[in-house]
Amino acid sequence: MITRKLDIMDCYMYRDDIFECYQTNKLIFDSQNPIKINTPDIAAEFIRDFVEAEDSCVMGLFDDSKKFLYGLVIFDNIRYANNKSCAQVHVVNSKTIFGEVVREIYDNIIIACGIDTIYAEIPAIAVFPINICKRLGFVKTGYIPEALPYINSKGQEKMYDIIILTYKRRKRGET
């Protein structure tokens, strides 16, 4: 598996793969969000905005031949001050690469990015992503009660909490 920073051409070249990642991770957008990624072209445009943004970095997870893109790690709202850095992270991947291998890749990306504090905001209904973050070393640092509407397995739209998870990079020599 190869990881590298995405460029604008990648957004279009891998638009079908990006679209599949968002189809696999339907809870990324709440039920009333105006963003609807329902075509590969919309998926490409959505990611292109992050690639072009000055305060974002998009990393792609590719197969060894770079024929397929299996996932994205988006560092957004990157900020630096007084030798410290912070960013919000968004992660999506295709259903073809769930498991221990992808967790190890995400772990390596988070360690290598060099950002001191990384945070994720995940709806409480999205149990799988919350558990992945916890396995990567993220800690629950807060929540926003009844913040986003989602349709549950019974077809009911309800307001769910947003869980805030934070990862603090350890300095060399710390355990």
Model features per residue range: what roles?
Residues 23-48:
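Conserved GNAT-fold acetyl-CoA-binding loop/helix
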Residues 38, 44-84, 92-95:
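Acetyl-CoA-dependent GNAT
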Residues 125-142:
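Conserved active-site alpha-helix within GNAT-family acetyltransferase domains
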